[in-house]
Swiss-Prot record:
Feedback inhibition by threonine. CDD domains: ACT_HSDH-Hom. It catalyses: L-homoserine + NADP(+) = L-aspartate 4-semialdehyde + NADPH + H(+); L-homoserine + NAD(+) = L-aspartate 4-semialdehyde + NADH + H(+). L-homoserine binds at E188, D199. Belongs to the homoserine dehydrogenase family. GO terms for biological process: methionine biosynthetic process; threonine biosynthetic process. It comes from Pseudomonas aeruginosa (strain ATCC 15692 / DSM 22644 / CIP 104116 / JCM 14847 / LMG 12228 / 1C / PRS 101 / PAO1). This is Homoserine dehydrogenase. Gene3D superfamilies: 3.30.70.260, Dihydrodipicolinate Reductase, domain 2 (3.30.360.10), NAD(P)-binding Rossmann-like Domain (3.40.50.720). Keywords: Amino-acid biosynthesis, Metal-binding, Methionine biosynthesis, NAD, NADP, Oxidoreductase, Sodium, Threonine biosynthesis. A sodium ion is seen in the structure; a metal ion may subtly affect the relative position of the nucleotide-binding region to influence enzyme activity, and could increase the stability of the enzyme. PANTHER family: HOMOSERINE DEHYDROGENASE. Catalyzes the conversion of L-aspartate-beta-semialdehyde (L-Asa) to L-homoserine (L-Hse), the third step in the biosynthesis of threonine and methionine from aspartate.
Length: 434
């Protein structure tokens, strides 16, 4: 059979890795796909010194690839929202299958893109958009298809995980570790997407849609970053038997779905609590299988290329099949997607870590306990430290049982109004993941 002809748009880290893997493992890939996969054209603004593209035609215009009649599959690896969106729609319009690693594109424009792809009978594959080299999308969409997924939780941004790991292991401050992450290339010059949870929210949006069979709704995901975390809270969490991770959590409830990204205390004996550095991990809990864990490199040249090429193999296998018999993009048929709402954060339920800076006066603890009790908030554990020499304040650390967030909001407002409490109350959510 003739090889399938692929056009790669973007020859940066992932694009270069994809080209190299396709070239190096060409024979093995052909054996798996049933026919060869040939890179027939590349769109790139500049060469990649880590790639020997040889005689492969190169253009500076990505739309040359989308409009090339010889190309069967367009691989979109340019990133961003605008140009990538236009490129993918043009490729679909021209009847080409698409493989992308662009989580922002899928999270924000995926509903539109998948609808256009169905109209044209083409495939859009996006395994590499979440957690790099970990095939977690395929695991949820296909491997766990017998299950009603109850919840999933993931460390899905390597930059944030590197920062929190360094803060815990070496006692370093957030600004100090962020500067190193930027120097090492883990974080961008503008690290907002990584440290404020936007990148993780893109990925969580995709995972939740596949797990629960709901439309992509990135705009309804609650997002909270790690830039305000202090070494003190990392250390207190450690003393209580927890690790702080920047976690994406999606949960099915009777009222709707929770979709939230935020710093989270996890018991230190959980496997996911011990995922350190730039590595990623995703836990998925299904009613039949129980809890499963998927771990690996969440980024990088060839780990991400591994998922891109795996998608290419799947596309080659499925491109001649009847579109009605293909695995749906979001695991469920479009007319079977749930319309249950995404819950606002105030309606979500969690346990909470609260750090209160109390004045060294008698009766403050009793006042705190009364405020929590009046709002139906039960305390699981409490830790009081010695008064700090600098300002005479006593750090009071509480861990509550699970409760609706609105009650915690009300309690924090009342606590901060107490004369015996100084400054804002620190609140970090707690998940047992069992």
């Amino acid at each position: 059979m003739k090889p399938v002809k692929v056009g790669i748009c973007g020859l940066g880290t992932v694009g270069g890795g994809t080209f190299n893997v396709l070239e190096r493992n060409a024979e093995e890939i052909a054996r798996r796909a049933g026919r060869g996969i040939e890179v027939a054209q590349i769109a790139a603004r500049r060469p990649n010194p880590k790639c020997d593209t040889g005689a492969t035609p190169i253009t500076a215009d990505i739309f040359d690839v989308a409009c090339n009649p010889e190309i069967d599959v367009v691989v979109e690896l340019i990133g961003g929202y605008t140009l990538a969106h236009e490129l993918v729609l043009k490729a679909i319009e021209n009847g080409k299958h698409v493989v992308t690693a662009n989580k922002a594109l899928i999270a924000v424009h995926g509903n539109e893109i998948f609808a256009k792809a169905r109209e044209k009978g083409v495939i859009v594959a996006f395994e590499a958009a979440v957690a790099g080299g970990i095939p977690v999308i395929k695991a949820i969409r296909e491997g766990l298809s017998a299950n009603r997924i109850n919840w999933l939780a993931g460390i899905i941004n390597g930059t944030g995980n590197f920062i929190l790991s360094e803060m815990r292991e070496k006692g370093r401050t957030f600004p100090d570790v962020l500067a190193e992450a930027q120097a090492l290339g883990y974080a961008e010059a503008d690290p907002t997407f990584d440290v404020e949870g936007i990148d993780a929210a893109h990925k969580l949006t995709i995972l939740a849609s596949i797990a629960f069979g709901i439309p992509l709704q990135f705009d309804k995901a609650y997002t909270e970053g790690i830039s305000k975390l202090t070494s003190a809270d990392v250390n207190y969490a450690d003393a209580l038997g927890y690790r702080i991770k920047h976690l994406g959590v999606a949960r099915r409830t009777e009222s709707g779905f929770e979709l939230r990204v935020h710093p989270t205390l996890i018991p230190s004996d959980r496997l996911i609590a011990n995922v350190n550095g730039v590595m990623n991990a995703v836990m998925v809990n299904g009613d039949a299988v129980g809890s499963t864990l998927y771990y690996g490199a969440g980024a990088g040249m060839e780990p991400t290329a591994s998922s891109v090429v795996a998608d290419l193999v799947d596309v080659v296998r499925a491109m001649t099949s009847d579109p009605e018999n293909r695995v749906p993009h979001l695991a469920f048929q479009p007319d079977a997607l749930s319309d249950h709402p995404i819950l606002p954060i105030e309606a979500c339920e969690s346990a909470y870590y609260l750090r209160i800076q109390a004045k060294d006066h008698p009766g403050v603890l009793a006042q705190v306990a009364t405020i929590l009790s009046e709002r139906g908030i039960n305390i699981e554990s409490i830790m009081q430290k010695e008064a700090e020499e600098q300002d005479g304040l006593v750090p009071m650390i509480l861990v509550t049982h699970r409760v609706i967030e609105q009650r915690i909001n009300d309690a924090i407002a009342a606590l901060e109004a107490l004369e015996g409490v100084s400054g804002p109350v620190v609140r970090i959510r707690v998940e047992q993941l069992n």
